[in-house]
Design a protein with these regions (language model features):
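Cofactor-/ligand-binding subdomain signature composed of acidic, glycine-rich
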Residues: 1-59
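N-terminal small/polar loop signature for handling phosphorylated ligands or for N-terminal nucleophile
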Residues: 44-157, 163-164
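Active-site/ligand-binding-proximal alpha/beta "capping" segment
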Residues: 186, 190
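A generic alpha-helix surface/boundary motif
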Residues: 9-10, 78, 182
Length: 199
């Protein structure tokens, strides 16, 4: 493998340890294509998520893009926010919770801000899979949730409009190690190939 690819034996060994043990697999690994990605609709609730986002965009409903303050959460928020702007939705805001006063995950403070600002939909990225009570609280304020997470769920899944998480036991998506941002990418990829190319 090292000789065929003209790479160091150390790198070749790392590839083999990760199941990339042929030249064909290595070439695919080093030159990935969008065509190699799994169908986003294999993820549980994806159709519901797409329908709700389309409804919000069509009605110019205010959307809050919400994510944790770590790298995964921030990149997910940046990506989904930019994507929604690219498809023409301008009635947007984003929210990253304060790490010291709110901590990780969905916060009551963030939900209250969304309600005050007239937000009808929160897209939560890299968080929310265990926010059962907070999703119920948001609903009492007239705010819907789409959760795009990758953490292990608890026994009870939040009663959001859609809960996208490849680690759900009832999810048939073939790769359950996506990041939170990766789940957000899957949601965005369903709109237009032109916009997806620019991600």
């Amino acid at each position: 493998l090292a000789a065929a690819l003209r790479i160091s034996p150390v790198l070749a060994n790392l590839l083999v340890q990760r199941g990339i043990d042929t030249v064909e697999k290595a070439e695919k690994f080093f030159k990935p294509s969008l065509a190699d990605l799994h169908d986003p609709f294999l993820m549980k609730d994806m159709e519901k998520a797409v329908e709700r986002v389309e409804q919000a965009v069509a009605n110019q409903e205010k959307i809050m893009v919400y994510g944790d303050y770590d790298v995964d959460g921030c990149t997910a928020v940046a990506l989904v926010y930019k994507f929604l702007r690219q498809i023409g939705h301008k009635n947007l805001m984003f929210y990253i919770p304060d790490r010291y006063t709110e901590g990780y995950g969905i916060s009551i403070k963030g939900i209250d801000l969304a309600a005050r600002k007239g937000v009808g939909l929160i897209i939560a990225l890299d968080c929310g899979i265990k926010a059962t009570e907070k999703v119920v609280y948001a609903k009492t304020k007239g705010v819907d949730f789409i959760i795009c997470d990758h953490h292990l769920p608890a026994e009870e899944i939040p009663k959001a409009v859609a809960v996208l998480d490849p680690k759900r036991v009832d999810c048939s998506y073939p790769f359950d190690e996506l990041s939170g941002c990766g789940v957000g990418v899957k949601l965005c990829l369903l709109y237009t190939s032109d916009a997806a190319d620019e991600l």
